[in-house]
Amino acid sequence: ITSIEEMENEPSLGNGGLGRLAACFLDSIATLGLNGDGVGLNYHDGLFLQKFTDNKQREEKNPWITDNSWLTKTDVSFSVPFKDFTLQSVLYDIDVPGYKNGCNRLHLFDVETVDEGIIRDGIQFDKKDIAKNLTLFLYPDDSDEAGQLLRIYQQYFMVSNAAQLILREAE
């Protein structure tokens, strides 16, 4: 069964309470034949992989974006200004088909400048370099001020992109 599970990487979109709820909403809306797209961030690494070495837990990054991913890169891009810098977004879409009926989309925004090379030991990285880490991890450690600020930047980036996408589609 392991070889079957490894044939298609799980994007972890339905993991956790909110992720599962969002996936169910998108699927149900499509099944009912209603239009209703979702918006989020295109995190490069999802929930961490738990490894054990010498009877000690080690957290490793868990990349879910592979060459055969369901992500479709679009030509849509927006500028998101912050106080001291501006980030350029890249929009990816995932089709969410309903049961025997419609299909909606999950829109996932990424940054052009994300750098997986900044990952150090396991899942540690410089949380202050927003341009390089904004969409790096689904659940960055926010137990310190840098992590809390990163979460605020992530939320602002997502909301700004979502608003710009809605306005673009309303034209």
Locations of the language-model features?
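A conserved ligand/cofactor-binding region detector
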Residues: 1-171
